[in-house]
Amino acid sequence: MSGPSESERRTRQQRIDPRLEAAGWRVVPFDLALPMSAYDGCAVTEFPTSNGPADYALCLNRRVVGVVEAKRLTLGPQNVLTQAERYSRGLLGNGLDFDGFHVPFLYATNGEVIWYHDVRHTLNRSRQVAGFHTPAALSEFLGRDLGSACDALALLPNTHPKLRPYQVEANTAVEAAIAERKRQMLVAMATGTGKTFTLVNQVYRLMKSGVAKRVLFLVDRRALAAQAVQAFAAFEAEPGQKFNAIYEVYSQRFHREDLDGENRFDPNVLPESYLVRPQPGDAFVYVSTIQRMTINLFGRDAALGMSDEPFDEDAGQLDIPIHAFDVVIADECHRGYTTAELSTWRNTLDHFDAIKIGLTATPAAHTKAYFRDVVFRYEYERAVREGFLVDYDVVSIKSNVRINGVFLREGEQVGMVDPTSGSEQMDLLEDERQYDAADIERQVTAPDSNRQILEEIRKYAEEHEQRYGRFPKTLIFAVNDLPHTSHADRL
């Protein structure tokens, strides 16, 4: 039976075995009469070591490359990784030795939660993973050395002629965190200071040094994905060579409205095989919306409500292994989500066993909680002080509604919008209502007030255009961007 009284044997049969098989391992019992060559790609149960039998030994190319310690459902697996370490030390004659460990990849699981530890380097820390690595993944890991790649990265000059000093600082901070084996980190840079350029340069350095081969660049909207693809295509990685001439850059399909009419380009759509069957020789960047990746991982129902953009018609659920990407970058990761959306956002990022870098101008609480370490921060005040941003002048636009709120009298005819369906109907107020200034665009909208504010902004923008010959970049911070009652859409 399942639940608190579920035995370890039942947990293994009903939970752990299926998850190993889903990752491509064939679960078989140990047989002393069989040679090691018979166990290639197998999870061998009760595999003998000098410190007792391992629950599962993951075998590749006549060697044990992984050990899985199993516990019943009610026990937390993190604390039993030490048992897997004992088996690793006790598997003498395995042809591998990493400072006394003879098996490099260790797991502990209760069938629901999986903890993993790569013991090849003392700085590596155990971490929770969404599933077991595939045989192909562990084979690839054995052929890669993050320590050597980090050494190569440290020796790689960061001298791109368009880099600003603080952007070099950001790269240095990220690279130091990776060298320390941190897996989640946040880069916070003020709007207008070149976050995307900084990260495109960062991606190139990580790929050139061998720290990363496959990089996922996640954004929130297709238009932002199109801009990111263009940023990679325009980046001159080496003198006379653009990024996409050195490494492949892929994206999802775009709609016409996603593309900047002044900069037309033909995006390369990622072949599905790159996601479901990642190869050690692949080296590419994939730019995707987080909504599409959520569909790819968990199906269309999981992505409901994450965006007001229509679903991509060609998006479907795929069997994507957890090692599909070495680095995942979440751009503009400060966006506010509902509790359900936040859970889906986290699940999507958590699926990948990758270095995760969050990029934002304004770190939200959920962002800092997930990415943990703000490894670099470049704030607006410092950017102004150093001359990279121009300070703003405050212009007061007086609005009685924004100061005093709105008073609606009994019997007034008002439009009522259902925020769920978007349906609108006219109704007569039965009682008078007072809305404070803080309620504007949250509980009640004032179209005339919005119009007057925009007219005032337009006046200053047109003056700027006449003086400098171009319409100024303008950021408008809407109160909300909710389906059917969106202040942003009305503006």
Label the predicted regions.
Residues 75, 224, 292-295, 332-336, ...:
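Residues immediately C-terminal
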Residues 108, 286-289, 329, 355-360:
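Structural recognition of the conserved hydrophobic beta-strand(s) that form the central parallel beta-sheet
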Residues 295-298, 401-407, 486:
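Short, solvent-exposed loop/turn elements at domain surfaces
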